[in-house]
């Protein structure tokens, strides 16, 4: 197991505080996959939770903007929504034509909702990091919420921006599969980096780091599966009753 030097690392400031100094931190966080990288990042004098919150808000805002354009492109191209419950589409009214007004309304609505996406991103990101750090503490971790928040933001934000751009290209049917595979690969890489960040910030072993990250992921996944299964069963029962009473 890698041995960490507990002496606080205080690298000299890059001389470019604020937005000008963000990009080097992001590049280091995603291009040097090693737990020591996140020790150095979080011990930097410029590392603080306020900066992390700003990063996440901007990423959520940009993601909302790109999603608005992606939805508009799909609407303009006549790409229909794929329903997760088989057979449900026949009971949902489908638009047979799209006019310019509908496209404009979709775009404006999406753009206006982008700031809300940024706020929600901050809330859920902060909650997720808090849960991971709480579990890490139970495993004997010595890190803090602020440090893990900063490290995770430095990892997640650049990939969120990249994924947002890919979402626009995924609206094109030919490129949809390619962007989907690429997004999946990036998601796995982000998960690995987050485990390294938890390990570096909390100064413990790989088992504790993996457990701290994966336990919440598994719990959320199982919860979503249960919710989806419940909705599918309820929807199926409702559709059966509708068919029975239909003339």
What are these regions (language model features)?
Residues 1-62:
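N-terminal juxtamembrane cytosolic/stromal segments of multi-pass membrane proteins
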Residues 32-37, 75, 129-139:
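Hydrophobic transmembrane alpha-helix segments characteristic of membrane transport
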Residues 41-46, 98-107, 202:
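Helix-boundary and loop/linker segments of multi-pass membrane transporters
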Residues 60-75:
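Alpha-helical transmembrane segments of multi-pass membrane proteins
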Residues 74, 78-79, 140-141, 166-174, ...:
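Short helix-capping/hinge motifs at transmembrane helix termini and TM-loop junctions
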Residues 76-103, 241-247:
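Membrane-interface interhelical loops and short interface/amphipathic helices
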Residues 104-134, 145-220, 224-228:
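Selective recognition of hydrophobic, aromatic-rich stretches within alpha-helical transmembrane segments
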Residues 223-247:
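Juxtamembrane boundary at the C-terminal end of a transmembrane helix
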């Amino acid at each position: 197991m890698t041995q960490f030097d507990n002496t606080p690392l205080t690298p000299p400031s890059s001389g470019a505080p604020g937005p000008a100094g963000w990009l080097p931190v992001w590049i280091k966080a995603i291009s040097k996959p090693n737990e020591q990288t996140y020790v150095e990042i979080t011990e930097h004098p410029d590392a603080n939770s306020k900066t992390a919150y700003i990063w996440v808000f901007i990423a959520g805002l940009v993601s909302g903007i790109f999603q608005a354009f992606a939805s508009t492109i799909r609407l303009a191209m006549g790409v229909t929504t794929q329903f997760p419950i088989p057979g449900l589409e026949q009971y949902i009214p489908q638009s047979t034509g799209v006019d310019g007004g509908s496209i404009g309304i979709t775009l404006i609505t999406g753009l206006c909702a982008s700031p809300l996406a940024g706020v929600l991103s901050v809330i859920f990101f902060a909650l997720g990091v808090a849960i991971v750090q709480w579990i890490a503490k139970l495993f004997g971790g010595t890190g803090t919420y602020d440090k893990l928040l900063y490290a995770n933001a430095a990892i997640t934000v650049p990939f969120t921006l990249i994924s947002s751009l890919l979402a626009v290209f995924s609206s094109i049917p030919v490129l949809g599969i390619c962007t989907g595979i690429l997004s999946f690969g990036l998601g796995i890489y982000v998960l690995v980096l987050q485990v390294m960040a938890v390990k570096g910030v909390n100064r413990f072993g790989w088992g504790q780091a993996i457990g701290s990250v994966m336990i919440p992921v598994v719990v959320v996944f199982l919860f979503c599966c249960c919710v989806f299964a419940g909705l599918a069963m309820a929807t199926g029962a409702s559709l059966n009753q509708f068919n029975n009473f239909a003339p």
